Amino acid sequence: MSADRDDELAAALVAHFGGRGLRALPIAPAGPLRDPGLPVQVGPYFRATGESDPLSVGEWAAAAGWDAGAAAAQLRIGTDGGAELYFAPDRSVRAVVPGAGPLDLPVAPGVGAFAQGLLLLDRLLPAIAASERPDVALAAYRELRQGLLAVDPAAFDDREGWWPRVLDDLRRPLNIDSSAAFEVVDEHGGKRIVTEVGGPGLLHPEERLWHRLRAEGVEAGQVVRVYCELEPCMMPGHYCARWMAREFPQAEFTHGFDYGATAESRENGIKALMLSVAERRG
């Protein structure tokens, strides 16, 4: 990226997020990561490295109890709530998802392209989450996709890359609503089933339901069964399979339709759910 384009991007980031809405990493190479910095937060999908956070992926991983593998020595620039995003040796941005064998995903060819993508995402998220206007939400989704391709024509070449996963997550509720149900036991042993239906917006039905129950004073140990219409996800910004397994280790989990770990499996799960809904409606 040229110096002029760097300056234009820096001005756009400051104009949109404000100085306090950006976090710089002074040890980073020259560019947006050092000045003016990346957004502190963009919806559920990105949160910049905190001022007191470990700077290497390996340090962060060790503190969290997992092995970062080949990414251990790299500069950690933020998180999506489950994957750690980092500055790679070839100056690209990548994301590592912890697990038995860490999954390493392409994100962007450089920090500038990533910052432009985050700027687009933050501008368009409110419209994409406009549950009362599905036409507006779909138009904003398409604008985001085209904008990302304009920034990086190869953004969607790898369907398992980070940006394709973000867009899959945004598209899911635009295609079809899905639901979740928790069975909750009270202090007297009485049971009740509580449900939530998802739709356009930034929270999955599991997240909405747990937020609601926590606000009512329900504790995690009271959740004994979890049913999700779509298999709990491992998608950027959510990682429902992971947080629910952590929150409800005692619960029995079932789901109606596989969602899986690949783009193909996710697409097949959505199609199966849509077909089931159409059949029920006659």
Regions found by a protein language model. Name each.
Residues 88-105:
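Intrinsically disordered, low-complexity regulatory segments enriched in Ser/Thr/Pro
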Residues 122-282:
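Zinc-dependent deaminase catalytic domain
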Residues 101-130:
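Compact, glycine/acidic-enriched structural inserts
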Residues 1-86:
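A surface-exposed partner-binding patch
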Residues 81, 87-91, 184-191:
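Short acidic-glycine loop/turn motifs at beta-strand connectors
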Residues 78-80, 96-98, 185:
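Structured loops at beta-to-helix junctions and adjacent beta-edge loops in soluble globular domains
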Residues 90-92, 112, 197-203:
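A short, sequence-level motif marking secondary-structure junctions
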Residues 75-77, 114, 233:
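N-terminal accessory interaction module
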